[in-house]
Regions:
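Boundary-flanking segments of nucleic-acid-binding domains in nuclear regulatory proteins
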Residues: 1-287
């Protein structure tokens, strides 16, 4: 049988044959995937060859059209003249980026001058600043529903947490995307409104106050404060009081990095919490 270009036959442990597909471009040997049928492996090679040498047909902005959805109408399918059947969308992104930018990544990243896109599907990508390139080129982003995360040293790390967005933070209350695009994780596009647990900013145009709530059996008002650091410390103090009065609950702790230990202690000792919270704790209603 004639050897097919770009195809290498190999064996599984049980002796069954399968076929690896690869291509060499700009001096780099690129694996395209493994296939059960040699013709499929060869077709993957042919698709890769067309992508790498047909920049007028294959472009990153047209990625979605190369992978039409299964329920796409026949009319729309007809327009998808460059449909990809054998390569994964991740591999197509990798090839397009290597062709256009001369940089090979193992992740589905397409590089622009000051930012890059990380593709999670043909029609969905995230935008990041270039300074995050090293991290995301070596960490695979996964999506479960609206939950975006990477595996980092065996731990799940949410994408949002890397940008100061706390777990359970509410969009447009605790943080916001300035351009309204919640796939754009460039630092200039993320505004953290409430960086501390239990602290809610109120007011507008720089005239802000900070309401503090603590959740026990529902939310209790700790107080309203003039600055965010005092509010964050008030939350910590309220949590400590809850523990002192026998509430066995793990409250998050606010860390205020710009205060010295002495400044923190001074504010902690002087800050007040609401009479209603103290009354609830001392009356035993928390039991």
């Amino acid at each position: 049988m004639k050897k097919l270009t770009g195809v290498f036959e190999t064996k599984k442990k049980n002796g069954q044959s399968y076929y690896r597909s690869s291509i060499t471009y700009k001096g780099r040997h690129i694996s395209l995937g493994s296939f059960d049928i040699s013709e499929d492996a060869h077709n993957a090679y042919l698709e890769a060859d067309k992508i790498l040498h047909s920049s007028d047909v294959y472009q990153i902005d047209l990625l979605e059209s190369y992978f039409p959805a299964a329920d796409t109408s026949p009319k729309k399918k007809k327009k998808s003249f460059a449909k990809i059947d054998f390569l994964s969308f991740e591999k197509v992104v990798i090839l397009l980026n290597f062709r256009d930018n001369d940089i090979y990544f193992h992740s589905p990243i397409y590089l622009y001058k000051n930012f890059f896109h990380y593709y999670l599907s043909p029609d969905y990508h995230l935008t990041f600043d270039k300074e995050d390139l090293f991290y995301y080129s070596s960490h695979k982003i996964m999506r479960r529903g609206n939950h975006l995360f990477v595996a980092d040293y065996g731990m799940q790390v949410t994408i949002a947490s890397r940008y100061g967005i706390r777990n359970f933070a509410v969009k447009d209350r605790d943080y916001r995307f300035i351009n309204q695009d919640d796939t754009d994780y460039r630092y200039s596009n993320i505004e953290i409104i409430n960086p501390y647990h239990g602290v809610l900013r109120e007011g507008s145009f720089g005239n802000y106050s900070y309401r503090v709530l603590i959740h026990i059996n529902g939310n209790y008002i700790v107080g309203i404060y003039d600055n965010i650091e005092t509010a964050a410390i008030a939350y910590n103090k309220a949590a400590d009081l809850c523990h002192q009065y026998g509430i066995n609950k793990k409250f998050p702790v606010n860390y205020i990095e710009n205060l010295s230990p002495k400044m923190y202690a001074d504010i902690y000792s002087s800050v007040s919490v609401s009479d209603s919270l103290i009354s609830m704790l001392t009356s035993g209603c928390n039991q």
